[in-house]
């Protein structure tokens, strides 16, 4: 029966990833559990919510091989509260899983392994590799504009697609659009799938982990599932959203009459300050643009009003340059602008306007593979 010796910090990290996958409220007890399998010097931890399946292998000292399932939450809550030391996990059969560490012992109830779901096989129609860093970047650049409206289920995820050997991620909630891409090293056939938001968030945590910083992630696709393999020891299988993502290329403005170039950080910080005065019912800030200065203002019902001016400057740390329509006044939901400005760490940001009611194109000179579109609001 299972008996392993493992470093607490190693187990804590793996349980953290596993806990994120497991639903907080499970009426099916098996889905609230994590499966532990000790074999060949590794401890495999498997967790699932039936839409998403995560398998992780960590290095341990295997005293004896075996497998069991135990409450994910209980095991995680215990282990993360223990000091950094070695732990011994021992399957005691009918009396459960024993956890022993420095001056402590816990005994947890277990369930039969036979009742735990098995990860489905996938017959990939396409597969390719990309660096974890590049994959993390395109997901982070698009995850914030996924629609939360469940009636628009085809927008409840990130559209991953390949066109002419360039890998794209795109998302929209109908008010804004985010697109990010990276050129693939290998040539593959065009495809398109919609990755659920939950799955995108979970795989992002894994690829951003420091031990995967210089690793590649392999992506395998079928018509209804996607499989991620990271560093060989982490496998995530996810169902895909069964729907058609809109042709977003028609949403991207091609012509503009005015252009704003401004220091990204100053612009973001100013919007964040002015937005404090706004209220949830109607969140809007007004940009008043001219060649001399940018005025950002807002009026908040029952709160007051706010205004801040950014003057024209050619210095990088407070750069501001505007050309086009004289004295343009346009309104935005401040959160939409803040999300874009936080997604890309660039010195400058460019905004392209065609009218006060038309979508605005946002680009970053230092990150040309990222494109954002935001709809204005009336102010």
UniProtKB/Swiss-Prot annotation:
InterPro entries: DNA_clamp_sf, DNA_polIII_beta, DNA_polIII_beta_C, DNA_polIII_beta_cen, DNA_polIII_beta_N
Pfam families: DNA_pol3_beta, DNA_pol3_beta_2, DNA_pol3_beta_3
A GO term for molecular function: 3'-5' exonuclease activity
GO biological process: DNA strand elongation involved in DNA replication
Cross-referenced NCBIfam families: dnan (TIGR00663)
Known partners and oligomeric status: Forms a ring-shaped head-to-tail homodimer around DNA which binds and tethers DNA polymerases and other proteins to the DNA. The DNA replisome complex has a single clamp-loading complex (3 tau and 1 each of delta, delta', psi and chi subunits) which binds 3 Pol III cores (1 core on the leading strand and 2 on the lagging strand) each with a beta sliding clamp dimer. Additional proteins in the replisome are other copies of gamma, psi and chi, Ssb, DNA helicase and RNA primase.
Identification of the protein by name: Beta sliding clamp
Species assigned in the record: Rickettsia bellii (strain RML369-C)
């Amino acid at each position: 029966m299972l008996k392993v010796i493992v470093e607490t910090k190693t187990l804590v990290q793996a349980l953290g990833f596993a806990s994120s996958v497991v639903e907080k409220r499970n009426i099916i007890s098996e889905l609230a559990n994590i499966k532990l399998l000790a074999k060949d010097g590794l401890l495999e931890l498997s967790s699932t919510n039936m839409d998403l399946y995560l398998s992780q292998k960590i290095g341990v000292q295997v005293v004896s091989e075996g497998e069991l399932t135990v409450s994910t939450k209980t095991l995680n809550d215990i282990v993360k509260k223990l000091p950094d030391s070695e732990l011994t996990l021992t399957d005691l059969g009918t009396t459960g899983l024993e956890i022993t560490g420095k001056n402590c012992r816990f005994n947890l109830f277990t369930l039969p392994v036979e009742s735990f779901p098995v990860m489905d096989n996938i017959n990939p129609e396409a597969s390719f590799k990309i660096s974890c860093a590049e994959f993390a970047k395109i997901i982070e650049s698009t995850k914030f504009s996924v629609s939360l409206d469940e009636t628009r289920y085809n927008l409840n995820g990130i559209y991953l697609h390949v066109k002419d050997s360039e890998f794209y991620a795109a998302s929209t909630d109908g008010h804004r659009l985010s697109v990010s891409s990276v050129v693939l090293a290998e040539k593959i056939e065009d495809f398109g799938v919609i990755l659920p938001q939950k799955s995108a968030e979970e795989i992002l945590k894994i690829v951003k982990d420091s031990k995967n910083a210089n690793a590649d992630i392999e992506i395998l696709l079928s018509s209804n599932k996607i499989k991620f393999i990271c560093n060989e020891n982490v496998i995530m299988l996810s169902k895909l959203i069964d729907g058609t993502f809109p042709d977003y290329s028609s949403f991207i403005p091609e012509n503009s009459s005015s252009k704003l170039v401004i220091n990204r950080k100053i612009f973001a910080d100013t919007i964040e300050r002015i937005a404090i005065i706004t209220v949830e019912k109607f969140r809007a800030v007004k940009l008043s643009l001219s060649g001399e200065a940018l005025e950002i203002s807002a009026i908040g019902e029952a709160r007051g009003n706010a205004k801040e001016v950014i003057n024209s400057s050619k210095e990088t740390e407070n750069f501001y340059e505007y050309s086009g329509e004289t004295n343009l006044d346009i309104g935005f939901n401040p959160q939409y602008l803040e999300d874009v400005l936080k997604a890309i760490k660039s010195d400058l940001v460019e905004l392209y306007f065609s009218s006060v009611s038309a979508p605005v194109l946002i680009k970053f000179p230092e990150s040309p593979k990222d494109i954002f579109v935001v709809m204005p609001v009336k102010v």
